[in-house]
Amino acid sequence: MLKRIPVTQLRLGMFVQSLCGSWLDHPFWKRGGFLLDSQADLQRLRESAVKEVWIDASKGLDLPEEAAVSAAAVLPVTMPAGPSPARVALEEEIRHAALLCSRAKAAVVSMFRDARMGQAIDTAHASDLVDEISASVLRHPNALLSLVRLKTSDEYTYMHSVAVCALMIALARQLELPDPLVREAGLAGLLHDIGKMAVPDPILNKPGKLTDPEFGLVRRHPQNGARMLLDCRQVSALVVDVCLHHHERIDGTGYPFGLAQEQISLLARMGAVCDVYDAITSDRPYKKGWNAAEAIRRMAEWNGHFDPQVFRAFVKAVGIYPVGALVRLESGRLGVVLEQHGRSLLTPRVKVFFSARSKVPIPQQVVDLGRAGQTDRIVGFEPAEAWNFRNLDEMWTGLAKSTGSYFDAGTGNP
């Protein structure tokens, strides 16, 4: 269990997950989470500018009960909880999410342009954007999480940041992290690739294989991004940590430092999953993306890449049959997944429209596979290209892509 406590209540044997405040304020900037087992480290923390830390009570000592009550009473609230937005129908939130994605794309283009020109990152604007994305995920998580997968290869650099932000928020809520940490996770997702602005566009968008020097330049984006975020002095250690460590792997084979297991913070482990999932489900200049179902299957096979507990929570957040996936039912009908069921990952709502046996269209019908008495079930995924289905995305989004993009906000590249 994660708890935020004053440094005055730290004691030896506690596991410090992260430190609150700027990385410039504390002497542990190269570390992820660590067990506080040194009196010297404890003294350095108490003498630093850090006022509060996150501890993980499942990995070390917890607060005494009376101290926990005291901490809850005195700690400031980073983000007011307030009433949760009312959950709305998928169709309604899709329309809202499409507009939000357009605004988010424009905001990220502007933010990345500023970073490329050496200007300060507008973290206040970024935080407001995170709040909007978080509210959309709360109203209906399937809407925004599914819609951001429809970005074009030209939009990837910017919409990838929006997608990872939304995925981090959904995953943080699935892990039942406290609201302040959910917000930090979202901001970390939005800014995790800011260091790519130090990489020239011809390399970022190169359709062929990168040369060794080009690949080396791309691999430096975590350090470049961390420096940018440190320079702006307005983001927490958690956000910088994700930027610096989202390419680390749980088995120690990642980069830039080859960290492993508990050396990698929880949010960085989350960032690794969300970053890879969106990357492999997106069309890139050099590779067409996998469908969401194939991506989940492949990621499950990559032993040593991801924290297993975090990955299981991620699958629960996005679903085994993600919205927009083409599936075959036992009845021989083909349909597109419309919505996940909270009760079971195996019984989504599906819009059927085609007979695989007769190979002809059938009247469209929404089938709730989780309804009592429903005997039909999903038997597998189908590749849409194999059936030459066009406008499949319009079937579940209800949106028409008339300009080549669902998120055309009239913006150009920085």
Curated annotation (Swiss-Prot):
Keyword presence, Cytoplasm: no
CDD domains hit by this protein: HDc
Segments passing through the bilayer: none
A GO biological process held by the record: positive regulation of cell motility
Binding site for a divalent metal cation 1: 160, 192-193
Catalytic activity, as annotated: 3',3'-c-di-GMP + 2 H2O = 2 GMP + 2 H(+)
Activity dependence on pH, as recorded: Optimum pH is 8.
Temperature and activity: Optimum temperature is 30 degrees Celsius.
GO terms of molecular function: cyclic-guanylate-specific phosphodiesterase activity; metal ion binding
Domain HD-GYP per the UniProt entry, residue ranges: 133-330
Binding-site residues for a divalent metal cation 2, renumbered to this chain: 193, 221, 246-247
Entry's EC annotation: 3.1.4.-
Activity regulation (record text): Activated by Mg(2+) and Mn(2+).
Gene3D superfamilies: Hypothetical protein af1432
Deleted gene: phenotype: Disruption mutant has increased levels of cyclic di-GMP. Mutation leads to reduction in both swarming and twitching motility, to a decrease in pyocyanine production, to a reduction in the extracellular levels of the ExoS effector, and a reduction in virulence. It produces a flatter biofilm.
Functional summary from the UniProt entry: Phosphodiesterase (PDE) that catalyzes the hydrolysis of cyclic diguanylate (c-di-GMP) to GMP. Hydrolyzes c-di-GMP to GMP in a two-step reaction, via the linear intermediate 5'-phosphoguanylyl(3'->5')guanosine (pGpG). In vitro, can use pGpG as an alternative substrate and hydrolyze it into GMP. Acts in regulation of motility, synthesis of virulence determinants and biofilm architecture.
Cited PANTHER family: CYCLIC DI-GMP PHOSPHODIESTERASE PA4108, CYCLIC DI-GMP PHOSPHODIESTERASE PA4108-RELATED
Subunit architecture: Monomer.
Name of protein: Cyclic di-GMP phosphodiesterase PA4108
